[in-house]
């Protein structure tokens, strides 16, 4: 099975200085699984909301309101369980003039820790093309990293999967303001497959990369295969791979 070593890279540690945004709230009962643990799709929603708060705190919400995520990495070190309050720390791990890698750390008050990183592109909503970050944005976000020459490099580049197929019907509630399937919805599919692999437990890593948008009404299927402790997934419309995911032990 094809293996890209980038998938094994450790996420950067939280810095001791610079602009680190901190917020928190109680773990919602709507975001837990049958074991009362925070699900992956819940993690994705939470880090998206923390990102929106972070932009508002930086007074950048109106300057750079539109972002598209190309990759999300979720490292479940220890599951966060109900009841728990969650503290979120968000900071920039690397950036360039049009995109950035943003780290979010989740810490549960009753134990549990989840580390995440997202590769976000600032976009023009009308053209859906990358938009240049303001100097103020670069200065504020760049205060937590020395890497100001970030480049996009996909991790999940293996061949098409011919494994098990699982239909994944879409709903109108899955559609975002760009008229595409919201990035957090894919994590419902990842969770569906994770539950079929009972031997894959924390600590583990989940990676999701988005290749091209999925629109309402398109027939979506998940194809997946398992080799030892690694599970590969493709979200396909016909034979067109729209997103790829990977699960592996840490």
Swiss-Prot record:
As one GO molecular function, the record gives: fatty acyl-CoA hydrolase activity
Tell me which domain of life the UniProt entry assigns to the organism this sequence originates from: Bacteria
Q: What is this protein called?
A: Uncharacterized protein MT2057
Q: Which Pfam families does its entry note? A: Acyl-ACP_TE (PF01643), Acyl-ACP_TE_C (PF20791)
Organism expressing this protein natively = Mycobacterium tuberculosis (strain CDC 1551 / Oshkosh)
Indicate the secretion signal residues.
none
Give me any GO biological process, just one: fatty acid biosynthetic process
